[in-house]
Regions:
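Acidic, proline/glycine-enriched N-terminal capping motif
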Residues: 1-57, 61
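Acidic, low-complexity central loop/insert segments
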Residues: 5-14, 59-182
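Solvent-exposed residues in well-ordered beta-strands and their adjoining turns
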Residues: 18, 72, 151-152, 236, ...
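Short, conserved phosphate/pyrophosphate- and ester-handling motifs at nucleotide-, phospho-/glycolipid
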Residues: 19, 108, 213
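Short, intrinsically disordered, mixed-charge
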Residues: 27-35, 75, 81-89, 222, ...
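Active-site beta-strand->loop segment that positions catalytic residues and contacts the acyl thioester
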Residues: 49-65, 234-242, 283-284
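Glycine-rich, small/acidic residue-mixed loop/short-helix segments
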Residues: 175, 192, 198-204, 212-214, ...
Length: 303
């Protein structure tokens, strides 16, 4: 992989909320404490339904006059009506802006980040440039220091600059997995509880007060355990073959989970093939440093 290059990843879910009460509305629907979020700040969060299940996972980027929720593609049709349902008398308007932007991811070591991060973001975590209609967001999708660039199609200068210095989206999967950034619709969906992702400290405030789904989150926090959890894994396949997600993890004839995302690790030191992955694993098997020889001879290491 050429670490000097970024990644062109296409359209994402981009939801815009405007109005004086926009952050109040989001705070009532998110696990993160957004009561005091200021322009230029970014917060990672879950959006929950009334039962405390994960409707989405992504980042909230606050600007001077509007706030964006950004996540994996294909969610706006569900999320916009969900948010709008809870706007009653508040000064807030929600709309789908997904098709207006094309996304580029720039890791901290990429040529673009080295040359332009300071100019585009300064000391902020997000900013909007009217000159080229570009939204820049600090989002740890490929690790701390990653910049997500949302460029409008008509911003040809930015488009040309980014496209010439970016690979297609296929190459970024390994970095996303190693950075433990779950992808909604792949690693998690509406069946999951937020604590099953194992990123509580990044995404959940236990002190913010009431929000939609809060009772379920608080109850699970009091119990202190989940029945399954997303974990970082490495797999060593004895044969030099492929691994397609979802990949079932079977130990002594019993399913202990599924690999939800996987990317091959280049190595000349071992026979067969090595894979990094994210896996939803049953309780009793997802503890870090656990190691299992699965049925079929696959060696699973939980990291």
């Amino acid at each position: 992989m050429n670490n000097l290059m970024g990644f062109a990843i296409g359209h994402l879910t981009v939801i815009e909320i405007s109005g004086a009460d926009r952050n109040k509305i989001l705070n009532n629907l998110c696990t993160q404490d957004l009561r005091a979020i200021q322009p230029g700040q970014v917060k990672e969060t879950f959006i929950l339904d009334v039962k405390g299940r994960t409707l989405s996972h992504g980042v909230v980027a606050c600007l001077d006059s509007r706030t964006f929720f950004i996540s994996s593609p294909g969610q706006a049709q569900r999320l916009v009506p969900h948010i709008d349902r809870y706007i009653i008398r508040e000064d807030a308007v929600v709309r789908d802006a997904s098709e207006e932007f094309y996304a580029f991811l720039q890791p901290p070591e990429s040529r673009w980040s080295v040359a332009n991060r300071r100019e585009y973001l300064g000391d902020k975590e997000c900013s909007e440039r009217d000159s080229d209609q570009t939204l820049c967001v600090s989002a740890a999708w490929l690790g701390q220091g990653t910049v997500l660039i949302l460029s409008k199609a008509q911003s040809q200068d930015v488009w040309d600059c980014q496209s010439s210095d970016c690979m297609d989206r296929q190459g970024w999967e390994l970095q996303r997995i190693e950075s433990f950034w779950p992808w909604y619709g792949v690693d998690i969906d509406e069946k999951n509880l937020p604590q099953e992702l194992g990123i509580n400290t990044r995404t959940i405030s236990l002190n913010k007060g009431c929000y939609l789904g809060q009772e379920t989150v608080a109850r699970l926090d009091a119990l202190g355990q989940v029945q399954k959890q997303l974990a970082s894994v490495n797999l060593h396949l004895a044969q030099d073959g492929g691994l397609t997600s979802p990949y079932e993890l079977v130990l002594e004839g019993k399913s202990i989970g599924f690999v939800t995302s996987a990317a091959r690790i280049s190595s000349t030191e071992v026979s067969g093939s090595l894979w990094a992955g994210l896996a939803m694993i049953r309780r009793g098997y997802f503890q870090p440093a656990s190691q299992f020889l699965l049925d079929g001879g696959v060696l699973l290491k939980v990291g």
